[in-house]
Every structure is written in C-alpha cells, then in structure tokens.
Amino acid sequence: MPSFDIVSEIDMQEVRNAVENATRDLANRWDFRNVPASFELNEKNESIKVASESDFQVEQLLDILRAQLTKRGIEGAALEIPEEMDRSGKTYSVEAKLKQGIESVQAKKLVKLIKDSKLKVQAQIQGEQVRVTGKARDDLQSVMALIRGADLGQPFQFNNFRD
C-alpha cells in the first residue's frame, strides 16, 4: 500500500546561511549604520536572537531575517516569535525559536483534519511524524494538497513516499 510521512524539519545549515546573509544585509543597510544591531544563531537551543536599540529596529531585523529564510527555502512560519520583547538597558531583543518536529497536539490536529476529509486513507502518529497510508496514490496526493492548504501554524514536509 502506498504511504508517506508528514514531518516538520529544518535544515540547520540553511538557517546558518540565512543568518549570515541577514548579517551581511544589515551591514549594507544605511538605516542601521552606527547602530548596535545583531543576529545570533544558537544551534543548541535552535533559536535566533535578534537585538537592536529600539523595538521598531528589531521588527525591521525580523523582516530581514524572514526574507533571508524564505530565500533559503525555509518558511517564515518555522519561526516562533514571542509577542513581548526583552529589554535590558538600551537594548531590545527577541529570541525566535525554530519549530522542528510535530508535537502531539499538532499531530492530533493533522490526523483529525485527514479523517474529517473523508478520504480513504489512514493516518497514524509515530513519534514526531505522521504516517499516512492509502490504497490509491491519488488519495495520498489529495491529503498532501489538503495539508498544504491548511493553516496549521507550522510548515510541513512530505518524505518517505512509497508505492
């Protein structure tokens, strides 16, 4: 029976490249001349710290970062940005976490979405991924289109497609 896995993975090398490109962009921007602003990638915590001297500049830095991530093939929804900014002295900062893996609550939403679609497929939660099996390849492709179209707040990839 044909099957595929739904996963949520981020290539950390691409994230590193995007942060380096964003830092390069920052050096070339005239509105950030002589302004202490930075991007810091923490691969251990899978987060990116963005810091500057005003909250407006932090928002601009986040826009630069999102643009660079998109250029490198990583969706902007992969960043989990907190509502409130940290402030210490003259510096505002935000620690944006990278979403990887499918949490159990999100996996249950995926399975419910698939079952509510009334397609002839089965969905099973397997750790941090969801396996979808069905008799017809067309049904599996319909599930892929359904998930791409649904706004679940996290980017998903499909791998391990088997006939």
Curated annotation (Swiss-Prot):
Entry keywords, A to Z: Nucleotide-binding
Domain of life, per lineage: Bacteria
Gene Ontology CC annotation, any one: cytosol
Function: Nucleotide-binding protein.
Statement: the UniProt record of this protein carries the keyword Nucleotide-binding: yes
InterPro entries (alphabetical): DUF520 (IPR007551), UPF0234-like_C (IPR035571), UPF0234_N (IPR035570), YajQ-like_sf (IPR036183)
Keyword flag DNA repair: no
Assigned protein family: Belongs to the YajQ family.
Protein name: Nucleotide-binding protein YE3147
GO MF term (any one): nucleotide binding
Gene3D superfamilies assigned: 3.30.70.860, YajQ-like, domain 2
Short name of one Pfam family: DUF520
PANTHER family the record matches: UPF0234 PROTEIN YAJQ (PTHR30476:SF0)
